[in-house]
């Protein structure tokens, strides 16, 4: 916890510095996501179309920024960002998830990506996919890895539900 105003200023400055230093890497990841969307959708007319009109890419963009803030232990704001994107797109990506490069969401309504999900590189998700947790057993909270791991070069098609901490 932060004890005084000076400590708050120091923490805020450190988070801002870290975030600003990470912007080139975030941009590089997003450009690979744009390429994945453009390359993966034969209906895409241009990368500009993908950037300005694809809800899946919007959700990925918000996730990438929110995830960076989450990794910096910024409270509440990453979750607010992800919920805003969820409301705008129907795509729910928890900012704690770990998502590799060249990520493509096609027709993304109803996608859920849980907090401890790990997604490799070159992964494609279609509408209605859930990468979720199992319910707690006998009222006990589940700790640790609760969501699936998806390896590289995977495609998960419409309506699939993958639950628990296993690898696919």
PLM-predicted stretches and their roles:
Residues 1-83:
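Terminal amphipathic alpha-helical/low-complexity segments used for targeting or macromolecular assembly
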Residues 86-168:
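Structural signal for interior beta-strand "rungs" in well-ordered beta-sheet cores
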């Amino acid at each position: 916890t932060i004890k005084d105003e000076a400590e708050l200023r120091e923490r805020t400055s450190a988070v801002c510095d870290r975030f600003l230093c990470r912007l080139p890497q975030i941009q590089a990841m997003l450009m690979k996501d744009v390429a994945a969307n453009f390359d993966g959708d034969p209906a895409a007319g241009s990368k500009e179309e993908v950037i300005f009109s694809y809800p899946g890419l919007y959700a990925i963009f918000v996730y990438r920024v929110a995830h960076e803030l989450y990794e910096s232990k910024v409270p509440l704001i990453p979750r607010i960002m992800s919920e805003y994107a969820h409301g705008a797109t129907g795509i729910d990506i928890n900012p704690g998830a770990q998502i590799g490069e060249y990520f493509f969401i096609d027709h993304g309504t109803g996608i859920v990506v849980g907090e401890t999900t790990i997604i490799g590189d070159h992964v494609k998700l279609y509408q209605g996919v859930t990468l979720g947790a199992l319910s707690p057993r006998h009222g006990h909270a589940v700790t640790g890895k609760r969501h699936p791991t998806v390896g590289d070069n995977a495609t998960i098609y419409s309506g699939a539900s993958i639950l628990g901490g296993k690898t696919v």
